[in-house]
């Protein structure tokens, strides 16, 4: 457990309800299951002619993205809008941060605009925890991805994808393949899978892209793709994060694809009904063959759909937990 994850009680109110969503580490299985169940109920909203429920009417959700994103930012916007919240998205490239304003000052100024919730994506590990510790206690903080540390909503949408396609976790073999070292998605997935009872979690990649001590997550480590994929139910592919790499970790993308790219032939080693996932963006011909990404085993587009429902669940649950905490503190102050 990292020092960041040791701060996990910050996420819960006095009743054990979600008030911030910063990391999956340490969250009880019951709470993760509640998030999945709530998201399941929200999937129906997306099929309606009017895709809205009034749960966050009158609330303001501010998306503060210091890193580029398409799927995460857009699905958070849609999730908040479908909950009837007012939504602000900060364009960081034109914000005061480009003029030297600190992260803390930026959030303080946004807080003065009376936002009820911040969704924060940042290149630095721990940014979401820092904000949750220092902003007004009435404001809920949702981590949209921080450095290499965590991407909890991606982790949960991946769990929803697996549960909806496989029915549960208790008898599954799941392989996570690629750049494990730099992937916050891999960390969130390993934590969630273990908490939800998956008995066989595998990480597969070159030694240079496997974190030291990754076994502490309860995973089996493979450096041979064919061996690691044998009889798995779920394959989660990860992109090479060149922007986070330093030094010569890889000889070339072509060499990586030759050894670790998911092709139709290699997928044949998994179970016949295996599903293939990817958090995006996909690098075709680097970590995955187009025939696999677009094929019958792929549930990559389903992940995007489920992402809206998961983010609706997290936004609504965190706001409810904050409201309960506020009421508790007011009653005890009297």
Curated annotation (Swiss-Prot):
The keyword Coiled coil does not apply. It catalyses: carbamoyl phosphate + L-aspartate = N-carbamoyl-L-aspartate + phosphate + H(+). One of its GO terms (molecular function) is amino acid binding. Carbamoyl phosphate binds at residues 71-72, 121, 151, 154, 280-281. One of its GO terms (biological process) is 'de novo' pyrimidine nucleobase biosynthetic process. It is an enzyme of class 2 (transferase). Pathway: Pyrimidine metabolism; UMP biosynthesis via de novo pathway; (S)-dihydroorotate from bicarbonate: step 2/3. PROSITE patterns: CARBAMOYLTRANSFERASE. The keyword Transferase applies. Keywords: Pyrimidine biosynthesis, Transferase. Its EC number is 2.1.3.2. One of its GO terms (cellular component) is cytosol. InterPro entries: Asp/Orn_carbamoyltranf_P-bd, Asp/Orn_carbamoylTrfase, Asp/Orn_carbamoylTrfase_sf, Asp_carbamoyltransf, Asp_carbamoyltransf_Asp/Orn-bd. Belongs to the aspartate/ornithine carbamoyltransferase superfamily. ATCase family. Catalyzes the condensation of carbamoyl phosphate and aspartate to form carbamoyl aspartate and inorganic phosphate, the committed step in the de novo pyrimidine nucleotide biosynthesis pathway. Heterododecamer (2C3:3R2) of six catalytic PyrB chains organized as two trimers (C3), and six regulatory PyrI chains organized as three dimers (R2). This is Aspartate carbamoyltransferase catalytic subunit. It comes from Pseudomonas syringae pv. tomato (strain ATCC BAA-871 / DC3000). The gene is pyrB.
């Amino acid at each position: 457990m990292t020092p960041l994850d040791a701060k996990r009680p910050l996420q819960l109110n006095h009743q054990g309800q979600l008030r911030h969503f910063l990391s999956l580490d340490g969250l009880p299985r019951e709470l993760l299951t509640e998030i999945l169940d709530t998201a399941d109920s929200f999937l129906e909203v997306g099929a309606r002619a009017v895709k809205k429920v009034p749960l966050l009417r009158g609330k303001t959700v501010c998306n503060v993205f210091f890193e580029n994103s398409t799927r995460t930012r857009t699905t958070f916007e849609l999730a908040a809008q479908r909950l009837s919240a007012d939504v602000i998205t900060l364009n960081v490239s034109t914000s005061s941060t480009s003029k030297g304003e600190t992260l803390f000052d930026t959030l303080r100024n946004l807080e003065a605009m009376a936002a009820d919730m911040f969704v924060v994506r940042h290149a630095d590990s721990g940014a979401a925890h820092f904000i949750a510790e220092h902003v007004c206690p009435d404001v809920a903080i949702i981590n949209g991805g921080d450095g290499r540390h965590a991407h909890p909503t991606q982790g949960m949408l991946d769990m929803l994808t697996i549960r909806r396609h496989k029915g549960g976790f208790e008898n599954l073999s799941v392989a996570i393949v690629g750049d494990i070292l730099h992937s916050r998605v891999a960390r969130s997935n390993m934590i969630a899978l273990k908490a939800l009872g998956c008995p066989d979690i595998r990480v597969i990649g070159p030694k240079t892209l496997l974190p030291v001590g990754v076994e502490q997550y309860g995973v089996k480590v493979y450096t041979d793709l064919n061996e690691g994929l044998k009889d798995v139910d779920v394959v989660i592919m990860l992109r090479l994060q060149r922007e986070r790499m330093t030094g010569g970790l890889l000889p070339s993308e072509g060499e990586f694809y030759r050894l670790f790219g998911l092709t139709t032939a290699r997928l044949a080693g998994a179970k016949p009904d295996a599903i293939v996932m990817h958090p995006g963006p996909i690098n075709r011909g680097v970590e995955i063959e187009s025939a696999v990404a677009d094929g019958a085993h792929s549930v990559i587009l389903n992940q995007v759909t489920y992402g809206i429902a998961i983010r609706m669940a997290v936004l609504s649950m965190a706001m409810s937990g904050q409201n309960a905490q506020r009421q508790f503190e007011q009653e005890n102050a009297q």
